[in-house]
Amino acid sequence: MRDLLNFFDKPKDPLSFDAVRVSLASPEMIREWSFGEVKKPETINYRTFKPERDGLFCAKIFGPIKDYECLCGKYKRMKYRGVVCEKCGVEVTQTKVRRERLGHIELATPVAHIWFLRSLPSRIGNLLNLSLKDVEKVLYCEAHVVIDPMETTLEEGQVLTEEALQAALNEFGPSFKYGMGGEAVRDLLKKIDPEYLSRKLRLEVKDTKSEAGIKKLTKRLRVVEAFKGSINKPEWMMLEALPVLPPDLRPLVPLDGGRFATSDLNDLYRRVINRNNRLKRLQELNAPDIIIRNEKRMLQEAVDALLDNGRRGKTFTGPNKRPLRSLSDMLKGKQGRFRQNLLGKRVDYSGRSVITVGPTLRLHQCGLPKKMALELFKPFVYNKLEEKGLATTIKQAKRLVDQETVEVWDILADVVKEHPVLLNRAPTLHRLGIQAFEPVLHEGKAIQLHPLVCTAFNADFDGDQMAVHVPLSVESQVEARVLMMSTNNILSPANGKPIINPSQDIVLGMYWLTRMRPGAKGSGKAFSSVQEAQYAFETGLVDLQAVCKVRINGTLQETTVGRAILSDIVPKEVPFNEVNVTMGKKQIAALIDKTFRLAGAKATCILADKIMEYGFKYSTAAGMSIGIDDMVIPAAKAPMIADAEKQVTEIQQQYDEGLITDGERYNKVVDIWAQTADKIAKEGMNAIEKQTFNVNGKEVVGPSFNPIYIMADSGARGSAAQIRQLGGMRGLMAKPSGEIIETPITANFREGLTVIQYFISTHGARKGLADTALKTANSGYLTRRLVDVAQDVVVSEIDCGVEDGLEITPIYEAGEIVQNIGDRILGRTALKDVVDAATNEVVVRANQEITENDVKIIEGRGIDKVDIRSALICQSKRGVCVKCYGRDLSRGATVNLGETVGIIAAQSIGEPGTQLTMRTFHLGGAASRAVEQSVHTSRYDGVVKLQNVHAVTNRNGKLTVMNRNGSALVIDEAGRERENFKLVYGAVLNFKEGDKVAKGQTVAEWDPYSNPIIAEVSAKIQYQDIEEGSTMQEQVDAVTGFATKVIMESKSSDVKPTVFLVDGAGKTLNLPGRDIPARYLIPVGAQLLVADQQEVHAGDVIAKMHREASKTKDITGGLPRVAELFEARKPKEAAIISEIDGYVTFGKDVKGKQRVIVTPEVGEQKEYLIPKGKHVAVREGEYVRAGEALMDGPTNPHDILAVLGAKALSAYLVDEIQEVYRLQGVGINDKHIEVIVRQMLRKVEIRDAGDSRFLAGEQVERYAYMEENERINKEGGQPATCSPLLLGITKVSLSTDSWISAASFQETTKVLTEAAINSRTDHLRGLKENIIMGRLIPAGTGLTSYKRWKVSVHEDDDIGFVALPGMTSSVQPQG
């Protein structure tokens, strides 16, 4: 470890140290660093502009103002280097030392460092066992403290007010030592022996019984341990000498008009010096105590303000009423040292300009303005000019370049050739925001960008700007070419799909090229080759869209002329049937994907360029345009709207007669209009998607050539949703609050909107715009937190040897598969052999990567459970291993060692953040509310099988489901499960076990808007505790005059509204097959549907609870939901879940809470208290599994971890997060989320410390815990025990091992205070800390294994090809 001072001597090579430690500086050390004491508050002489001696800018202390010249001018020039002038005392040296030399101020009284005093928990207070208030009283001279009680009964560290002190003096006389102010606190701190105190506190912890006591002692023990384990001494938290920052870091610049601009620090220092000098003078004069106390307090406040202005007391402000920027403010926040200057720097050799389209460029090229290139490549041009002998000196070369002679341009072209440049568009949300291109010089002033890379950059040409950077060294050029070239970034790192996807005009052109037109000119001809067909088209014999036969790759194919032309540019490896379709956006994407998998990257780039060329060419030739007549209004629109209005009137009538509640009416009305809008949209689409063609006098119906339809169908512009607004009806709109307005807009844009309709539209739409602005900031902040939490996850080894993994199944939603198993396991490593159960054949061996072919086989054989390795369970100490991570999605091959998978994961999750909604619900301006699902319809023929279903037969002889976790399966002839329907409580089944079901038949149906309570036996109803006015009220609907019975909250807590099922004699019946009485607790807010003593049949509804008006899925969605999950927040009113498997019974209520008891078959029962008025989701006698919710409400992820463990938690988080992204149609691979969740589960909480060095309740890294326990087990001690912890991403980032990384993230002062007290060492293992220290990051080519390689360029080759390690040709290892 080297000291700060010697650190400044000469610039250190950033690689010459391995770790950085931060600790407290002792007063001796501060004086040792200093080049002299600053005694005066003066800065510079306003007439001579020379610094005042002994002042804040003193040349004697800090160094000369001019290079190699003393202040009085006696010694000038280099030859006197190192001489100290006897007249002015200035050393003759470079001015640069004024940036490095520290001074100091000798304080007249010790002063507390505000960080260690005020940063909670107060470190000084903790050590002295005093409250912060008391320490402040002593420091700010408001109270005395006992330093040494001697023979008296006082205690050391006891705080005495003036009155108490007088009383003590009267009682004991001056036989004890007391004091006030900084000296007293320093003396107390000096007396502390951390070793002894630590032992004492540890014993106290063992003896204490109370929770609070232990917590308090552990808190104190933490601070004591910090001092015990480090080189710090407690009294160093008090400053006796204050370092003064070098003057060039707090400059004073003269402005014109004789005024000065100065750094705020100078003001703060001046204040400290003034007060300090005044205090010294007062002490020399033996001034009265009260004046000295006041002065001491003011000195303490001045030093506080210098270190952290505004932390305590009133903030010091400058002349313009703005708070002064203290030393802490220099480090904190976005404008602080860490984030402004260390993590992000401005760089040389860069420029920026507006971008325009470069349709003639190849994929790896960009257009660079000549003027810009000349400036960027200046040094290279100078060098070439000298080489060619056109200039002999740099000065001469400079002159030539300034004159811009002809030779200069030639040389520039030569220099730029094959020298890649980096293009970057802000905001750089993922790594594809910076890519390398070869520059092509042009005369304009804008940068030209290849249209196909716009998706990756998220660029458009409406005035976007981009920055250019020039990689200088040969190594950086190699990396730019091999790793960053746009042609090497075809696949998206987020999901492994191509990101070079043509859009808009290109898609339109390709679609036009590959459409078929029945009866087009030259239909039915046959051609011997593609060239012949193209020739025929160009001479006008056949139409582009004519159906004909063409010989392609040796076989005669039925196709169109356009498709034949397209097939000519597609690589031979891709089969013709991939090309022989109408090319929409999706089909082109699939074609590019297929080409990449079959023909490789180079062929894909060539194909992409060709597709762009053809796309532009044919979209120009097609001449698409829209007229108002192309928006077809379906004839059926008017009758449909009339019909819907009729239905709405009927529902209104039902409501008026009191048959339904207002909530149900609203739901039904919204449903009717949503369905009507959909129907009209369908009609509208039918009207424009088909067209009748005349082929030789016969009428043939084919796909339409309506331009609007073409644009939407091809995916070039617009969507079905927009077409329905142009020609159908606009439909339902949402208010800014997210509710749906029940009167829809029946007009469309072709008919035009009335004023009221227009305002209904703008109402929701305006909210959308306001949202967008907020969304960007929120999304950016989420990305920043994600990057911070995952920045040190790097692929560190080949195989960690773990024998555990995750079980992957397809994802179902509402009985439909939303994600196949293939998509989830592709590119992952199999944990065990994947075996086909039918034939016992091994499909994939254990520890093999699952490839595209394997996926085909697995899906074909119907295997629906595969065990894979996962980053979540990887046992690597730092980072993850290759096997657990699997495939690098952006290259389609196994991941390399040193790949920064953490940051890629963070970017993949954060980048689509701006596409997610901010709303707490997920609807557009036009409300696209899905009609509530209320039936399960089978999509296959098969046999019904019921799984885990309890049911009763109802009045109509059908089965009513009586439990919550049953499901109905449909099994096909081969015995494979084709459908899996989750059944809700109260669903009515149309089939019994073993019944045959045909495709399209309804298996089950239920009421989606209410949760019913259903009778399980036929019996008579008997009320208990249901009395009108106390627990039930008859609510009379104001409009209809009909009454409904609603249970309300009762005044007394022991009343429970209950319905019993009794027989004729009034004896309570038991539930079928169990000796549990048939009784039903009716929750608050439920609507009773039966009267007292009424006869009911099994399956009848006794009461129903309304679900919220169509807000089922709309709890929190979008971005806030993702943030909530990653921050591991406990939801408000989270559901209580059962920790064990067992049967449910209800116990006696406690304080108005319902007591639910779960009794397992063996073992002890658990009790849960459920808040009053919450709906208990389980019923008496029901069997629940561990982890099942006992009440309605959101799940708390911490509970899942505690009850079901890390795997279940990760599955929950991955599913929940993916669901949000799926709704927006964003594909993210599971492994990215797993990497983040792994980081969230890094720590464990120590339950019992045993013989370890940990404290109970401490949070430690999992591997540190395991290492410590191994050590204890070897020594035969008692190991520590722990419980797993789920931390939110912000918490994880702040509690990382690296203090540099944590300080640059958030809460800078807190992190640095903590680190300094513990004298923490940062071993520079992550990426951020290395960037901050100015080193290469330990990832990719920055890994130690690459450091031995030296790159050389062979001049004799024609091409300037440079190889990377692994390509033997031109790389020699050093040493």
Curated annotation (Swiss-Prot):
InterPro entries: DNA-dir_RpoC_beta_prime, DNA-dir_RpoC_beta_prime_bact, RNA_pol_asu, RNA_pol_N, RNA_pol_Rpb1_1, RNA_pol_Rpb1_3, RNA_pol_Rpb1_3_sf, RNA_pol_Rpb1_4. PANTHER family: DNA-DIRECTED RNA POLYMERASE, DNA-DIRECTED RNA POLYMERASE SUBUNIT BETA. Binds 1 Mg(2+) ion per subunit. The gene is rpoC. Belongs to the RNA polymerase beta' chain family. The RNAP catalytic core consists of 2 alpha, 1 beta, 1 beta' and 1 omega subunit. When a sigma factor is associated with the core the holoenzyme is formed, which can initiate transcription. Gene3D superfamilies: 1.10.132.30, 1.10.150.390, 1.10.1790.20, 1.10.40.90, 2.40.40.20, 2.40.50.100, RNA polymerase II, clamp domain (4.10.860.120), RNA polymerase Rpb1, domain 3 (1.10.274.100). Zn(2+) 2 binds at residues 800, 874, 881, 884. It comes from the Bacteria. Its cofactor is Mg(2+); Zn(2+). This is DNA-directed RNA polymerase subunit beta'.
